[in-house]
């Protein structure tokens, strides 16, 4: 997993986080961590 910095849509726009992760070659992403402020990308 890869964590992106803030500003990738979290916590209010999880879709933006997902799109960011796809744009860097990952399979997708979601908002995680404290108050869902961190965009976490996944491969599988």
From Swiss-Prot:
What Gene Ontology terms describe where this protein resides (cellular component)? extracellular region
Write out the annotated subcellular location: Secreted
Q: Which Pfam families match?
A: Defensin_2 (PF01097)
An example GO BP is: defense response to Gram-negative bacterium
**Entry annotated with the keyword Disulfide bond:** yes
* Residues spanning the membrane: none
User: What InterPro entries does the record point to?
Assistant: Defensin_invertebrate/fungal, Scorpion_toxin-like_sf
Q: Which PROSITE patterns match?
A: INVERT_DEFENSINS
Q: Would you say which domain of life the source belongs to?
A: Eukaryota
Recite the UniProt keywords alphabetically: Antibiotic, Antimicrobial, Defensin, Disulfide bond, Immunity, Innate immunity, Secreted
Would the keyword Phosphoprotein be found if you checked this record's keyword annotation?
no
The chain's disulfide connectivity reads 10-31, 17-39, 21-41
Q: What does this protein do?
A: Antibacterial peptide mostly active against Gram-positive bacteria.
Q: Which protein family is named in the record? A: Belongs to the invertebrate defensin family. Type 2 subfamily.
Q: What is this protein called?
A: Defensin
> Which organism was this protein described from?
Ornithodoros coriaceus (Soft tick)
Top-down, what is the taxonomic lineage of the species of origin? Answer: Eukaryota, Metazoa, Ecdysozoa, Arthropoda, Chelicerata
């Amino acid at each position: 997993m890869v964590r992106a910095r803030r500003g990738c849509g979290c916590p209010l726009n999880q879709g933006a986080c997902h799109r960011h992760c796809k744009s860097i070659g990952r399979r997708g992403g979601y908002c995680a961590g404290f108050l869902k402020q961190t965009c976490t990308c996944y491969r599988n």
